[in-house]
């Protein structure tokens, strides 16, 4: 943003507010409702989204878009079976934000980035951040499921709105053929993310289709759930508000959520080896070293000239 008036308008936007940020730890919980006919997953990912915002220097609208995608990927990953299983989301729309990439695991780890993190757009007529316009109304949502064994499973659907939640709901109903209702939210102020998270309701096999509009209506009751989290409301309390009179049973287990990237200097050095001896020698003579930036976490790795020479020596010694 380039002027104070623009900043003030953004502060007044729905989803942006000033005040004390939520101190709730990032976590995921599971539950059932309607006598076990509805599967429920809810999560808080405030610190994870804040770390993504800081690492990538995200604008307001980029923070909300990536935060929604991170929460969505974590919700989908929660239904995987093996601890090493992971979900990859790619939203490739025609908007100025470019592409969104997110990687999340059953273990609660998540990372992600956007192509154009600094982009900002005018607010909508309802004074909301225009995530759909930033992502784009036309394009595709790609979902890769790595189950931890065999070949990963990939599917794609057209974007419905670019708002992320609608697109995930459409993917689940059309590709996975699971009637679902998804609620995603990010609440932030000029300093930090105050609350972020999501709720996923899914019909269990054999459940009556009449429960589908019921699920949608229940989530509509807590449409502004991220501001509620930001004001100190707990995730369990929010689920009680949404489903408390529908035989809600919350599992006692709670899974920790955190931003985590598996990049490290050894991986960077391994990637440099792939460039070949001649390319590395050119780096030594021209650049006196090498620099690499991880796209997912924006971590900068600097490989010294001596380290490059060691890599070349190892390559030369290998038959």
Curated annotation (Swiss-Prot):
* Pfam families per the UniProt record, alphabetical: HSP33
Broad class of the protein's primary localization: cytoplasm
Q: Where is the composition biased (Basic and acidic residues)?
A: 1-10
Q: How is it modified after translation?
A: Under oxidizing conditions two disulfide bonds are formed involving the reactive cysteines. Under reducing conditions zinc is bound to the reactive cysteines and the protein is inactive.
User: Which compartments does it reside in?
Assistant: Cytoplasm
Name the SUPFAM superfamilies for this protein. Answer: Hsp33 domain, HSP33 redox switch-like
Extract the ranges annotated as region (Disordered).
1-25
InterPro entries, per the entry: Heat_shock_Hsp33 (IPR000397), Heat_shock_Hsp33_C (IPR016154), Heat_shock_Hsp33_N (IPR016153)
Cytoplasm among the record's keywords? yes
Q: Where is the signal peptide?
A: none
Asked if the Swiss-Prot or TrEMBL record annotates the protein with the keyword Cytoplasm, the reply is yes
Keywords on record:
Chaperone, Cytoplasm, Disulfide bond, Redox-active center, Zinc
Q: Name one GO cellular component term.
A: cytoplasm
Q: List the disulfide bonds.
A: 261-263, 294-297
Q: Where are the annotated coiled coils located?
A: none
Q: Biological process GO annotation list? A: protein refolding
Q: Which HAMAP family match?
A: HslO
Entry's family note: Belongs to the HSP33 family.
Matching PANTHER family: 33 KDA CHAPERONIN
Summarizing the function annotation, the protein's role is: Redox regulated molecular chaperone. Protects both thermally unfolding and oxidatively damaged proteins from irreversible aggregation. Plays an important role in the bacterial defense system toward oxidative stress.
| Name of the molecule in the record | 33 kDa chaperonin
Q: What is the lineage of its organism?
A: Bacteria, Bacillati, Cyanobacteriota, Cyanophyceae, Synechococcales
């Amino acid at each position: 943003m380039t002027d104070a008036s623009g900043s003030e308008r953004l502060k007044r936007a729905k989803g942006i507010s000033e005040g004390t940020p939520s101190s709730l730890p990032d976590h995921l919980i599971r539950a059932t409702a309607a006598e076990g006919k509805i599967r429920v997953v809810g999560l808080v990912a405030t610190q994870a989204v804040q770390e993504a915002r800081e690492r990538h220097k995200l604008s307001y609208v980029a923070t909300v878009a990536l935060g929604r995608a991170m929460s969505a990927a974590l919700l989908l990953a929660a239904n995987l079976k093996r601890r090493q299983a992971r979900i990859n989301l790619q939203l490739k729309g025609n908007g100025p934000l470019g592409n969104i990439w997110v990687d999340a695991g059953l273990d609660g780890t998540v990372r992600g980035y956007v192509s154009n993190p600094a982009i900002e757009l005018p607010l909508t007529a309802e004074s909301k951040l225009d995530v759909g316009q930033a992502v784009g109304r036309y394009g595709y949502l790609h979902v890769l499921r790595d189950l931890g064994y065999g070949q990963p499973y990939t599917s794609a659907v057209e974007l419905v709105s670019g708002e992320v939640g609608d697109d995930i709901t459409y993917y689940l109903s059309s590709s996975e053929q699971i009637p679902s209702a998804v609620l995603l939210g990010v609440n932030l102020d000029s300093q930090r993310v105050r609350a972020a998270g999501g709720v996923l309701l899914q019909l269990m096999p054999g459940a009556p289709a009449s429960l589908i509009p019921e699920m949608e209506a229940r989530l509509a009751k807590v449409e502004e759930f991220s501001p509620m989290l930001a004001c100190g409301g707990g995730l369990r309390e929010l689920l009680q508000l949404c489903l408390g009179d529908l035989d809600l049973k919350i599992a006692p287990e709670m899974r920790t959520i955190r931003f985590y990237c598996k990049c490290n200097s050894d991986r960077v050095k391994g990637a440099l080896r792939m460039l070949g001896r001649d390319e590395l020698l050119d780096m030594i003579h021209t650049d006196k070293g090498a620099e690499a930036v991880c796209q997912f976490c924006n971590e900068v790795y600097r490989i010294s000239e001596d380290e490059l020479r060691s890599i070349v020596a190892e390559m030369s010694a290998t038959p």
